[in-house]
Swiss-Prot record:
Name by which UniProt lists this protein: Sorbin and SH3 domain-containing protein 1 homolog
Record's compositionally biased regions (Low complexity): 270-279, 448-475
Protein source organism: Caenorhabditis elegans
Deletion phenotype: RNAi-mediated knockdown results in no defects in brood size or locomotion compared to wild-type. No defects in cytoneme length of distal tip cells.
Annotated tissue distribution: Expressed in body wall muscles, muscle arm attachment sites at the nerve ring, all non-striated muscles, and distal tip cells of the gonad. Highly expressed in the origins and insertions of the vulval and anal depressor muscles and the spicule-associated and diagonal muscles of the male tail. Expressed in small puncta throughout the uterus, stomatointestinal muscle and proximal gonadal sheath tissues. Not expressed in the pharynx.
Source taxonomy: Eukaryota, Metazoa, Ecdysozoa, Nematoda, Chromadorea
Function according to Swiss-Prot or TrEMBL: Required for organization of sarcomeres in body wall muscles and for maintaining normal mitochondrial position in myocytes.
Major location (coarse): other
Disulfide-linked positions: none
Signal peptide: none
Amino acid sequence: MMHHPHPFGSNLANSSEPQQPSGQYLNPAADAYNFDTFEDSDKFSPKGNVAALRNVIHGQLDMKTPTGNSSRYQKPAPPPVDSTPSWAKNVKVYEPNGYVDPHLNKHNMGRVLDGPVNPNKYFQGVPPASYSQVKHNESKPPVPPSTKPPHSAAQALQAQVLQSSKAPSQPQQSQKTSYRIPYDVALDPRHHLGEFDIDDSASIISSCISTFGESSEIAGFSAAAEQRHLYEQYRKKLMEEKNELKEGSETPCVSLSEKVMTSSTENLKNGNNQQNQQPEPQPPSSSIFNSELTPFGHVAPVAKQFEPTNFPPFSPEKESEIKRSIDLESSQLLVKSKSPAPYSTSSTDHYGTIRRKHKPVAIDLSKSSPNLASQSPSNLFFGASFEEKQNRSPMTSTPSYKEQGFKNDSLNDSLNQAFEIASSIETTKNAYEAPPTPKSASHDRSISDTYPVSSSTTSTWPSHTTTPTTTTAAAPIAAVAPQTYTEQQPMSTSMSSSVMSTNMDEPIVVGSHQQIPQQSPDSSPERNEDMSQWYRKMFKQMHRKGEDGSNEGKEQHFINPSNVTDGIGRTTPTASNLGRSRENLSFNQHRPDHPSSYFDSLEHGPNDQYNNQERVKQSNEEELLRLKAEKLAEELRKEKERKHSFIPSSAPSLQNNMDRLNSLLYDFSSDIQEPAHRDYTPQPVMTATAVYKFEPRSARELPLNRGDIIRIIREVDGYWMEGERNGRSGIFPTSYVQINTGNQGDSQKMRAIYPFTARSDTELSLKRGEIITRRRQIDSNWLEGSNQIGIVGIFPASYVEPIEQVEQHIPTIVPNRPKTPKIEDQVYNQVYKPNETVIMQSNQGYYDKAAVVPNNKVRFDLPSGSDSNLQMSLNPHQNQFPPTHTQTSTQQPSNYGMKKIEYEREKVVEEVPPMHMDQYRKLNDEPKNPKKDTNILMNAASLIPKGSEMYRAVYPYQPQKEDELQLYTNDIIFVVEKCDDGWFIGTSLRTGDFGIFPGNYVKRH
């Protein structure tokens, strides 16, 4: 049911009659006449009836709207408010029910599954910048009424701060506290006097400030001023307490140098106070796991210690004078303004981190022995060994060796050493705890071998007798403790303090009331033998003799054992055991008065360094020579073991050529430049013919194919020669080639009288009438020779005949094979005459076709006679290749000095037009010898275009067009032009055809 407000003015405010429901008005017209039933007519003036009636009608109309939306007669209702922020609509995070302490559940807080993290709830460091910005001119919708507004995180934190200011109900708080405490103060008795609330509140304040910062809304709530006040109060309290600790002597916060130099009277008084109480016996801890660990920043709990029978009783300090640890790190972190809460092991905000638990150092400097002031603090903390003396800064005056371990260092040295030992030594129990059970030597082998320790009694035994007695051993012991003991507790050196983290469950206490245990069962003969070996090894290292074997001029060093103990569960040899070690080391030489060998060795340093440099330089040179010899030997071995992939049966073997590279190693590796070119007397060129195929194995070798002609440069040795082939020089085996006797032109020429077809690669095919150069005679039936294109092979001796004299006429017998290029007699007689030389001219500047040779033969155009410089003779002795140059038809005749080769595929004979024949004229009326012209025309080599390159077909190729050239394997092609698209233009020697062919099908020959 819907209740409307009073629309009839202020006169209806005190009306006691109940309003009738608006549902009784069925139509607006009835409301105008029956409004007196709704309210009494005498309670409002007639002047307001119209306005009241209008409001009633409007209300009824709004109620009857089918959509239920806001009408134009009243203000629209505010839109529903979405409680979920825009950034968290698609976010899934860990949200526990109710308020969650961020310190106890921080391992689950802010675990974002998808999307960002809400900075209002989850402490993820500094919130985004948009969180701290204030949006201006932003109208927020009215909040719907609620019974009780929920508490925000800021209010919850404020309530927590206000609640923490109250005094705790119990004097000691549990380990798991719900607040972030700088360091655990629950076990600190000084916080039981009403100081815990300040520490607790300051912890929360520092945590809030470090987490949110001043710019966040959390830091701006109403309790910010009180937080500042509490924090300042805590800092003031801390500074006052620090000043009190400096003035008093109950904590080691005072200057350590002043405590070290305390007078003996105060030490005696403090020592007498220890006789009041005596701790109850307690069994030693058997393992590091059952020992109670002390968190970093805690006060070491007072443990009851077992008292040996031979020790004088002593009493611990009172509760007010209990020793506290030096926690400089935590105090400095807390003093900083707005710094994060210092680390505490009691809080749970370190999940997922790995941090070594720190153990405080309990140092009692207020109750030192009377002889403590006379003993050097450096010896107390670092020992008097040789290594420790080198680590420290040199003193103003060098004491004698006997008094070195008992002299007082400077005040600065003692202060620095005290702070160093306070920051390096870590332990878990205080000085009143009983010593643990010593461990076996096998468990500490790594430490004992690297940092051996020994009894402080041995600090003086080098100057005494071989077997020290109890009387001599009691003197240095009395300097540390007021009692006389047979054996002193092992002391740790400064080096061994760095490895004490391995056994941190054992006590390390520096004070006048140190307990001296009995000899450990670990002091076995095997242990003594190990220590002797270590001392012997160190002695040899420090007294290394020179190369001459003498030890004169060098002072012997002795590693003075340390007199500071390390409580890592093992004991070292006693004075008697070290005495036996001294006998083994055989100290028979005189010991100097002071250990100055380290400084004396610096005087001889430059000479030794110079000698060392000379030795290193000499050894380096020898090493380089040795490496070079090994490299050469390895190369020789590889060359000796190398096998060729193709070795003919008749070829000599290279496997036994052991010394074929001896001279090569010196010739090719030497840096000596060859002399410049001189005027040598011309000598005939020596050539060789490759008989077998040779594949190179290095860049210095020259590849050879069978039949290659090599120009010999020099003879390397009896097995290798250096030569040149096709512009490439290199070495090759002598047994793979045959030396040509005499020049190439003087070789015997032979003519093939019968055609011969080769049946193997070693044979040479012959064509009838082909000129062959004879090389050698294989046997009575076979000869070896090369044809005019350089192919070498064997052929029957009966198929050729020697050429004794030059023919006097042009032969009429020509090879039957039409593939061999030649010139017909008719064409020759028509164009060329024996007694004259003709040229061809063209009015257009181009050469025209003078004749077409039938049967795909070659037509030659003689050079122009207009240029006398380009006239060529037909005498082969004057010009070896007169008509071999090929040019394109676009060149002008004045610049064209070579003949032109054209080919016709159609077998049609054309007559030369008269106009062209008239252009021929005589150049020379002198008769020429027709015999020489016949030799040139019949020589197939004369058909090779001048300037062309010879290629050999590697793959067969079938032409696809008319202008393409057919190729067979091993065909010889003379290439005259190379196109950019990879196609070559040339002439096939086998067919005489001219055309184009793919360039990747041929190889340079």
